[in-house]
Amino acid sequence: EISSLEKACEITDNCFQYILTYIKPGMTERQIADEIEEYYKKRTEGLSFETIVASGENTSKPHAVPTDRKIQENDIITIDMGCKVNGYCSDMTRTFFVGSVPEYIKPVYDLVLKNQVQTLEQMKDGISTRLLTKMVENDFKLNGYDLIHSLGHGVGMEIHEAPYVSYRSDTQ
């Protein structure tokens, strides 16, 4: 089980590395999603869920559907994707930029990154996932933003499995 999960995550990470070299201004979100699907078809049992590729203003939607919006220079892109290996799922989300990071986005990007690093450092046996989420939510509010999604979840044979890292869960 663990080796299948590790393999699925390794392939997904490799797909991210590949797709970063593939994306060019002028491509559509849908073209990128199709390329990800082709990548997985050659290496795995297929997608563990429908790939999300969101760019520009679409990145503000947690579960965006790929559109015909064209990627522009200095665009922000969020990709949420995963595959299945021996029935076990991967699920990774990454946000990056095509070109340079626009100055107006840097504070938000840095806030998210800071909270990701701090949350990973705080994760240990006995800490409540609700508390972890509350810490991030409080920091977002202090900086003028709302937390509009959970922080994460486990994976396995299902794409969403315990532990759930959200204010709705009190897993430790």
Task: Name these PLM-found stretches.
Residues 1-172:
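Active-site neighborhoods and metal-handling regions in enzymes and metal-associated proteins
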